[in-house]
Protein backbone atom coordinates (compact mmCIF):
# COMPACT_ATOMS: atom_id res chain seq x y z
CA UNK A 1 0.00 0.00 0.00
CA UNK A 2 1.10 3.55 -0.60
CA UNK A 3 3.15 4.93 2.26
CA UNK A 4 1.01 8.07 2.17
CA UNK A 5 -2.21 6.06 2.53
CA UNK A 6 -0.72 3.99 5.33
CA UNK A 7 0.42 7.08 7.25
CA UNK A 8 -2.95 8.73 6.71
CA UNK A 9 -4.78 5.62 7.96
CA UNK A 10 -2.67 5.70 11.12
CA UNK A 11 -3.44 9.37 11.73
CA UNK A 12 -7.15 8.80 11.16
CA UNK A 13 -7.15 6.00 13.74
CA UNK A 14 -5.33 8.23 16.24
CA UNK A 15 -7.89 11.00 15.74
CA UNK A 16 -10.68 8.67 16.90
CA UNK A 17 -9.32 9.01 20.45
CA UNK A 18 -8.68 12.77 20.24
CA UNK A 19 -10.84 15.52 21.70
CA UNK A 20 -13.32 16.93 19.17
CA UNK A 21 -11.81 20.41 19.42
CA UNK A 22 -8.28 19.14 18.75
CA UNK A 23 -8.64 18.46 15.02
CA UNK A 24 -11.03 18.57 12.10
CA UNK A 25 -11.10 14.77 11.80
CA UNK A 26 -11.69 14.31 15.53
CA UNK A 27 -14.64 16.70 15.27
CA UNK A 28 -16.07 14.68 12.36
CA UNK A 29 -15.78 11.44 14.32
CA UNK A 30 -17.44 13.12 17.30
CA UNK A 31 -20.36 14.31 15.13
CA UNK A 32 -20.91 10.79 13.86
CA UNK A 33 -21.30 8.86 10.63
CA UNK A 34 -24.14 10.98 9.25
CA UNK A 35 -21.96 14.12 9.37
CA UNK A 36 -19.09 12.23 7.74
CA UNK A 37 -21.43 11.04 4.98
CA UNK A 38 -22.77 14.56 4.52
CA UNK A 39 -19.21 15.82 4.02
CA UNK A 40 -18.50 12.96 1.62
CA UNK A 41 -21.57 13.96 -0.41
CA UNK A 42 -20.44 17.59 -0.52
CA UNK A 43 -16.99 16.58 -1.68
CA UNK A 44 -18.49 14.32 -4.37
CA UNK A 45 -20.49 17.21 -5.81
CA UNK A 46 -17.49 19.55 -5.66
CA UNK A 47 -15.37 16.97 -7.50
CA UNK A 48 -18.00 16.57 -10.22
CA UNK A 49 -18.26 20.34 -10.71
CA UNK A 50 -14.46 20.68 -10.82
CA UNK A 51 -14.27 17.92 -13.45
CA UNK A 52 -16.90 19.64 -15.61
CA UNK A 53 -15.00 22.93 -15.31
CA UNK A 54 -11.66 21.25 -16.10
CA UNK A 55 -13.09 19.69 -19.24
CA UNK A 56 -13.69 23.20 -20.58
CA UNK A 57 -10.76 25.13 -19.11
CA UNK A 58 -8.12 22.38 -19.35
CA UNK A 59 -6.93 23.56 -15.91
CA UNK A 60 -6.95 20.41 -13.78
CA UNK A 61 -5.69 21.86 -10.50
CA UNK A 62 -9.15 22.18 -8.94
CA UNK A 63 -10.23 18.67 -9.94
CA UNK A 64 -7.04 17.26 -8.41
CA UNK A 65 -7.62 19.28 -5.23
CA UNK A 66 -11.27 18.22 -4.97
CA UNK A 67 -10.45 14.58 -5.72
CA UNK A 68 -7.95 14.65 -2.86
CA UNK A 69 -10.74 15.96 -0.59
CA UNK A 70 -13.07 13.23 -1.84
CA UNK A 71 -10.52 10.49 -1.23
CA UNK A 72 -9.68 11.94 2.18
CA UNK A 73 -13.30 11.99 3.32
CA UNK A 74 -13.79 8.48 1.89
CA UNK A 75 -10.92 7.34 4.10
CA UNK A 76 -12.49 9.06 7.11
CA UNK A 77 -15.73 7.19 6.37
CA UNK A 78 -13.95 3.85 6.04
CA UNK A 79 -12.09 4.48 9.28
CA UNK A 80 -15.32 5.39 11.07
CA UNK A 81 -16.70 2.04 9.89
CA UNK A 82 -13.62 0.23 11.17
CA UNK A 83 -12.24 -0.49 7.72
CA UNK A 84 -8.66 0.03 6.53
CA UNK A 85 -7.83 1.49 3.10
CA UNK A 86 -6.01 -1.75 2.30
CA UNK A 87 -9.41 -3.43 1.94
CA UNK A 88 -10.23 -1.11 -0.98
CA UNK A 89 -6.82 -1.69 -2.56
CA UNK A 90 -7.34 -5.44 -2.18
CA UNK A 91 -10.72 -5.16 -3.91
CA UNK A 92 -9.19 -3.16 -6.77
CA UNK A 93 -6.43 -5.76 -7.09
CA UNK A 94 -9.06 -8.50 -7.19
CA UNK A 95 -10.79 -6.72 -10.07
CA UNK A 96 -7.59 -6.07 -12.02
CA UNK A 97 -7.71 -7.95 -15.30
CA UNK A 98 -11.38 -8.84 -14.80
CA UNK A 99 -13.77 -7.58 -17.44
CA UNK A 100 -16.22 -5.05 -16.03
CA UNK A 101 -19.03 -6.96 -17.72
CA UNK A 102 -17.90 -10.24 -16.15
CA UNK A 103 -17.55 -8.62 -12.72
CA UNK A 104 -21.04 -7.14 -12.94
CA UNK A 105 -22.53 -10.44 -14.12
CA UNK A 106 -20.93 -12.22 -11.16
CA UNK A 107 -22.74 -9.84 -8.78
CA UNK A 108 -26.17 -10.16 -10.41
CA UNK A 109 -28.48 -12.91 -9.17
CA UNK A 110 -29.35 -15.40 -11.87
CA UNK A 111 -32.93 -15.32 -13.16
From Swiss-Prot:
Protein name in UniProt: Phosphoribosyl-ATP pyrophosphatase
Transferase keyword on record: no
Subcellular location: Cytoplasm
GO process annotations (BP): L-histidine biosynthetic process
A GO-annotated cellular component: cytoplasm
PANTHER family: HISTIDINE BIOSYNTHESIS BIFUNCTIONAL PROTEIN (PTHR42945), HISTIDINE BIOSYNTHESIS BIFUNCTIONAL PROTEIN HISIE (PTHR42945:SF9)
Species whose genome carries this gene: Pseudomonas putida (strain W619)
Cysteine pairings via disulfide bonds: none
This protein's pathway: Amino-acid biosynthesis; L-histidine biosynthesis; L-histidine from 5-phospho-alpha-D-ribose 1-diphosphate: step 2/9
Reactions that this protein is recorded to catalyse: 1-(5-phospho-beta-D-ribosyl)-ATP + H2O = 1-(5-phospho-beta-D-ribosyl)-5'-AMP + diphosphate + H(+)
E.C. no: 3.6.1.31
Annotated keywords: Amino-acid biosynthesis, ATP-binding, Cytoplasm, Histidine biosynthesis, Hydrolase, Nucleotide-binding
GO molecular function: ATP binding; phosphoribosyl-ATP diphosphatase activity
Family to which this protein belongs: Belongs to the PRA-PH family.
Amino acid sequence: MSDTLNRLAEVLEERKQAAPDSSYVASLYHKGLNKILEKLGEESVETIIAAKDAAVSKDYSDVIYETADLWFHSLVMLSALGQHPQAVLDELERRFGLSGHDEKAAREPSA
